[in-house]
């Protein structure tokens, strides 16, 4: 959209019709209009405050619909989907949980920059691990961050990222977002891994050793 608007600006500067074509040679733009070649020398144009010769800004508001009386609708234009699988190891005597591996599958639309997306997923998995096992803040309690634990590089397991490309009709080049989407599934995946390993359900995060031990004792079978 911005490119089309910039094209129209160039055609107007050259005095060419809308159906003319544009060619670029040695810092000059040439509008070709019914055999006429109409040059525009960009080197003689003043720069804007950002150092550009010509710019155009376009705003695109993707189509959405409000929720109806039943709470149904499309308040967002694009929806991403993701699922995480966590392989964990639980020490039933100490209540400690170690995450061995995370597999993360995400529908990202068109993966324009796969390396950047993988980094986003890995970072989200790290944040989710902290949410699941370490990080806890109680409003009104605690005078500093001394006891607020966060994951270190030694806590982060290998993360296998699976990118699913189901393109969006409104995203740029078919892309979708991958922000909180990488954080949200991690903690549930880890808690499900704990349940699969020893049969307990931890209902409150973080799953600290004392909470895991309490759940084991409540189950009545420390060996799982």
Residue ranges and their predicted role:
Residues 1-224:
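C-terminal catalytic domains of large/alpha subunits in multi-subunit enzymes
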């Amino acid at each position: 959209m911005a490119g089309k608007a910039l094209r129209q600006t160039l055609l107007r500067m050259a005095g060419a019709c809308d159906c003319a074509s544009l060619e670029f040679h040695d810092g000059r733009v040439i509008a070709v209009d019914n055999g006429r070649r109409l040059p525009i020398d960009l080197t003689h144009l003043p720069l804007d405050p950002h150092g550009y010769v010509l710019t155009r800004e376009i705003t695109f508001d993707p189509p959405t619909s409000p929720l109806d009386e039943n709470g149904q609708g499309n308040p967002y234009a694009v929806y991403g989907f993701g699922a995480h699988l966590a392989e964990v190891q639980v020490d039933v005597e100490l209540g400690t949980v170690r995450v061995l591996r995370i597999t993360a599958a995400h529908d990202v639309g068109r993966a324009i920059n796969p390396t950047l997306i993988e980094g986003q997923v890995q970072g989200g998995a790290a944040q989710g691990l902290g949410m699941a096992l370490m990080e806890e803040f109680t409003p009104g309690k605690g005078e500093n961050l001394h006891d607020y634990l966060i994951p270190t590089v030694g806590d982060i397991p290998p993360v296998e990222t699976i990118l699913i490309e189901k393109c969006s009709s409104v995203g740029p080049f078919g892309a979708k977002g991958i922000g909180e989407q990488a954080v949200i599934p991690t903690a549930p995946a880890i808690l499900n891994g704990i349940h699969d390993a020893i049969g307990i359900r931890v209902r409150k995060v973080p799953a600290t050793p004392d909470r895991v031990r309490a759940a084991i004792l409540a189950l009545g079978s420390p060996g799982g």
